[in-house]
Amino acid sequence: MSEVIYYTSDEVGAPSFSNTVGAFTALLDACLVNGFNARTVTISVTGGVATATASAHGYIADRKLLIEGAANGALNGVTRIATVPSSNTFTFPAPGGADGTALGTITSKRAPLGWDIRHTATNKRVYGRTEPGRNDDVLLVDHTVAATIKYGGAASATGVDTRVEPYGSDANNWCYTTAGVTSPILWT
């Protein structure tokens, strides 16, 4: 069974979502592909537990982070935050991490879901999954008109406007979402 990984609009560094053209593609870029709330951290390891220090990081326990840049490769990769003892520290499991202060230019950020951008144009994307054994199904998103988001799935795509074997007819495959709000929209 896959674990649930989620993000919320109230997290520090989370992208804002509004009726501004491109806001939805920026949100998906952050959550699916790039991550967000990047911080430079220092890490010390004791007994298989890493304690990271980053000023006002805003991270939340049990959320996934991506650690990069540690000279000890055992510390790098996606991990789950174990505890948040203070606004400047958090801990995570560090099996294989040698006791002591980690070397390197180390960064942390909310881990992306592991998708990539197969095709891109201004405020249009074709996203695909990157895990081994995946199929070539893609998510297509068009946020070129304010307050309207077109999205749909397909077996593959050769460009942002060229779908191969879309799921259903265009009427069923492309969904249009329109909202008349002017303030940022809360999201999970």
Predicted regions and their residues:
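Surface-exposed ligand/attachment interfaces on beta-rich extracellular proteins
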Residues: 47-55
